[in-house]
Amino acid sequence: IGLVGSEMCIRDRGGIVGVLHQNPEDCVEKHVEDTLTAGAGLSDRSTVEYISEASDEVINDLIENGVDFDRNADGELTFTLEAAHSIRRILHAGGDATGRGITEALCREVRADENIVVMENAVAAELLVDSDQECKGVIVYNELTGEHEIVYTSALVLATGGLGQLYKYTTNPDGATGDGIDLAYNAGAIIQDMEFVQFHPTALALSPESKDRFLISEAVRGEGARLINNHGMEFMSKYHDKRELAPRDIVTRAIYSEMNKEHKFNVFLNASMIDHMKLFKRFPTISKRCGECGIDISAKPIPVAPAAHYSMGGIKASVEGRTSIRGLYAIGECASTGLHGANRLASNSLLECVVCACLLYTSPSPRDRSVS
């Protein structure tokens, strides 16, 4: 129910974590420690370990299902660096269009499966939960007919994304209004960690009035771009020894501090030191969007400011997607599994989506259990 291939994942211009055997310098232990550190020690270690260990298998499943991850001239997967990662382990598709690459490949599989009925132009209005706290279905509003319909279910999965549109400035699409969390809350599900909302440090900020904040992936900083203030001075060394590659919450607070000092609505991201051919090949979507705004990212700094980006909190769920209501499951950003703690590590979100979806699908007798 809903729009297949909606913008939530398509907008992901970062990548997906892959702790793979093809990358001998990396290991599960390193990824786990990076995740726990970024999450301010509030992540659930067992969840982090499980999802990290599963990454090799699910990445290869994605490849088998048609996701074309970027490779070098020798045909080997290329790994890139993003903030708070201790090693290059991020996979991309189409340079800076990883979310689109994964979503479009999986949507093709969905539409080709005769056993899957897709209901688009339909909005979930209310969950049907009985007196025993078991989900029996959902009331759906059909936007084409203007009528409400009841869909009875043996298992219902919420994968409704985040809530960035609750904020003035956000990188999220219009549909990111937290509706899935609201549906679950009204049905009596346990909601947790809603105080933890991540602000991405670098969203395109052309003016204070511009509310559509196009995401400038931190992968640009991973390739060497530097943050500068309105006087052209670098400043991140004052805030953290990893500079631009510090955890997102630290970089965001540093940018806000510089903006407040100068009474400005933005700072700038200077990518001119990156090889120009590499820059345009690696970030085609970003360079195109900035070009449409009159910014040649190889020569001119990009105006950026923090914007609401990701909710760590949501519907309390296990890694299999089980919630406190039997028969109701939640995966992705609307769920809160304990993976992200207080601050999500870059590119862990797509990995969580895929791992939890696979585990939900393969779990035996899911209806018999719930999360307390």
Enumerate the language-model features and the residues they cover.
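FAD-binding beta-loop-beta segment adjacent to the flavin cofactor pocket
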Residues: 310-330
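Single conserved hydrophobic/aromatic residue that forms the stacking wall/gate
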Residues: 1-5, 10, 361-372
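An anion/pyrophosphate-binding glycine-rich loop and adjacent beta-alpha core
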Residues: 183, 189-296, 300-302
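Short FAD-binding loop at a beta-strand-to-alpha-helix junction that anchors the flavin cofactor
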Residues: 325-343
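Glycine-rich loop(s) and the adjacent beta-strand/alpha-helix scaffold that form part
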Residues: 155-208, 214, 348-356
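Conserved redox-cofactor binding core of oxidoreductases
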Residues: 63-147, 152, 159, 203-207
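Conserved N-terminal glycine-rich FAD pyrophosphate-binding loop of Rossmann-like flavoproteins
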Residues: 6-7, 11-25
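Short beta-strand to alpha-helix junction loop
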Residues: 47-53, 91-105, 171-173, 178, ...
